[in-house]
């Protein structure tokens, strides 16, 4: 399929003449974009620009709020951080990992909903908004920490989906996992439609369930817990 270019796209302004168009102030070189407003669609979806990854920032802030409101005393120090420049090289996560030197990292980001036209489920998986957080399998994801996430989801009746990545997750998980001699890391993803557009879409229940999964998982981690499969 031919990608969009100046030969196959057009702007429909509802005009019938060049003069009518110019009267609207539209001319060659005018900047065109989608209407930039956050909205709730059909009572189910949040729609807006840059939900990737402002949604992640919201979800981890909600985890912090729940911990405080429920007066939870964790047996370890917890850093809740939001990174920058993930899209151009995981730079923020690399700096955070070097500065904090974490023992464990739970990362949240978005992943593609694959239910829309022109997406190949064979290559990208069968993932859907509204069916729960996505738990990833990848070289950067520590298997025992991942199993703990899944166990928490099952015990708390939190719906979840599975996704596999052969090389990279494409998220900050890759930065944390290979920092400081290796950090047990896991990725919880939020299904999202129309990534990198001004109309990104996520399901309200998925947002709530990502928050629940991170929160409940934190309550199960022990101080000094060893996630290694093999020890000396």
Where are these regions (language model features)?
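N-terminal hydrophobic/helix-forming segments and targeting peptides
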Residues: 1-232
